[in-house]
A protein has these predicted regions:
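Membrane-embedded alpha-helices and immediately adjacent juxtamembrane helical segments
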Residues: 1-323
């Protein structure tokens, strides 16, 4: 059953075929509904569960990530990335990640690259790391107002594919992260090279986060896939918010809060879990935002040929918001 198209549709973008075609009044509607859905879907509570799975998947994810990345890049490349991330992450969190990465790399050097043990460990690492992706898939399914309809194997294979995609995107980001400074050294630049290199690196990180979120928003929910233009807006907004929020979070932890006095030896874990929770909130918020953008228009936002409302296989595409 479809909903009737609201009055003054031309002022609210009910016939918009792209995000850019939604007028100001429509954007106000989208933002209001996004805030309401954040509360209705208990996003902050759901994000705590997703953040917990992120923490559990940290070691397996680093194992899988480094196992592939070390085939393409030296270990120093990943340490360079952690040094840059230290600018937006609390010191205790960066130290914990660095320690875990060193352990993984040391274990890798003690084993034969083609051994059965390594291959088996890599597969298990993929599967364990996919637990966090499965949690995120469930969260974005809720954000898009859907219920899980996929079979057990379809759900888990999708999660595994998204996990592999995330690792591949991360590796390409690190390759670009390393190659950009090398390329700039051959250009006739002034003495401000160091500043320029550091500034150029950040769009690479933002781009990697945006691509990863776009893939998650498109393939993660249990629904017919949305067209690319209806997922990238939320991905871009979430990426920028994640970077800015991480900077503010780091400032708060290092200058205002004293988690070590309260949590003692567990302070690093607590801070890392809080950052994972914040990252999950931002990622789910991007999905909520995308969902309300689709909900604003009566035009088919799903892939393939245009279908009438009620036959699109996605709640927000099959219904138009009343306000």
């Amino acid at each position: 059953m479809t909903e009737s198209v609201p009055e003054k549709s031309s002022q609210r973008g009910v016939s918009a075929r792209s995000v850019s075609a939604i007028p100001l009044y429509g954007w106000v509607d989208v933002l209001k509904r996004t805030w309401a859905q954040i509360q209705n879907d208990n996003v902050f509570l759901i994000s705590a569960g997703v953040g917990f799975y992120f923490l559990l998947a940290l070691a397996p994810a680093l194992t899988a990530f480094s196992a592939i990345a070390t085939l393409l890049l030296p270990p120093e490349a990943m340490r360079d990335l952690l040094e840059e991330l230290a600018r937006i992450l609390p010191e205790s969190t960066t130290a914990l990640l660095t320690s875990q990465l060193d352990t993984v790399l040391r274990d890798r050097q003690q084993e034969t690259a083609l051994s059965i043990k390594v291959a088996t460990g890599l597969l298990l690492s993929f599967w364990a790391a996919a637990a966090a992706v499965r949690a995120m898939m469930t969260a974005v399914t809720v954000a898009y107002r859907e219920t899980e309809q996929r079979s057990f194997w379809q759900f888990h294979l999708t999660a595994l594919a998204l996990t592999i995609a995330a690792i591949v995107i991360g590796i390409f980001a690190i390759v670009a992260f390393v190659l950009i400074p090398l390329a700039l050294t051959f250009l006739p630049l002034s003495g401000s090279n160091e500043i320029l290199i550091r500034l150029i690196r950040w769009p690479v990180i933002i781009g990697a986060v945006m691509i990863g979120l776009s893939v998650t928003y498109r393939f993660g929910p249990s629904r017919r896939q949305a067209k690319t233009r209806w997922v990238t807006t939320g991905a871009l907004a979430a990426s920028v918010l994640w970077l800015g929020g991480s900077l503010l979070f780091t400032t708060y932890v290092e200058r205002l809060a004293d988690y070590e006095a309260v949590h003692g030896a567990l302070s690093s874990i607590v801070v890392l879990l809080l950052w994972f929770w914040f990252s999950a909130v931002v990622a789910i918020l991007g999905a909520e935002f995308n969902a309300e953008l689709e909900h604003q228009t009566s035009v088919d936002t799903t892939i393939g040929k245009d279908r009438p409302m009620g036959q699109r296989g996605a709640y927000v595409a099959d219904h138009v918001a009343q306000k």
